[in-house]
Amino acid sequence: MWFKKRIIIKETNILLKVDDKGYFKKAEEIILKNRLELERYILKNPYFLTSYFPVDVEDDAPEIVRLMAIAGEIANVGPMASVAGAIAEMLIKNLNAKNIIAENGGDICLRAKKDVIIGLYAGNSKITGEVGFRLKKEKIKNIYGVCTSSATVGHSVSFGEADAVTVFAKSSAIADAAATAICNASRGRDEEEMINNALEKADEIKKIDGIFVVVKDKVGIKGKIPELVKTDKRITLGELFDIY
């Protein structure tokens, strides 16, 4: 059995699904701790918040700060591009649940001993709610990240035009930063050029397994992505979790 709770702390809005509801209180403590450490670091180092480029941090910086800095360096973006994925990753890392999914604004970190299907939300594209990704239990038995960036959905800054760029990686912080970088590159005269530019950008980023790009009703795929499945559910990414 799975239990669900939405945890909202300032900008953090996490939908948590876990196999034991006894983890909810600990989850709130972990989120709050990491947010406070990040906020305190930003007060002393405001450039960490505003930079669109990688930022070097001290070896003794808080773990979440170091995680975000590494993700930003790998994807060649500012560290805050990975904040949602990083908070979700720190949560999964510090909870001992065998089956746990944390969705933070469309960025997902999970660990499970069962197959999980995650739905895709790509704005007004016809693909929204029609397809999902089946993540095999062998792939997600340890921490795994599935993060999506969009130029047409949400309030995050994007310089691209893709409706959705979904990245799969063994770190949700890295997946989040990579999704931002790849989405930023999705520019061009038509859908095909936008997708090709996004796929070329993905070639520059290490430590990601694969990407799925949606521009209107066209898609592009690079690397290894989970099995695509038909969902027939017009529902946002994060609310659709089918567990087997």
UniProtKB/Swiss-Prot annotation:
UniProt xrefs under SUPFAM superfamilies: ApbE-like (SSF143631)
Leader sequence residues: none
Origin superkingdom: Archaea
Matching InterPro entries: ApbE-like_sf, MA1715-like, UPF0280
HAMAP family per the UniProt record, alphabetical: UPF0280 (MF_01079)
Family according to the record: Belongs to the UPF0280 family.
Protein name: UPF0280 protein MJ1526
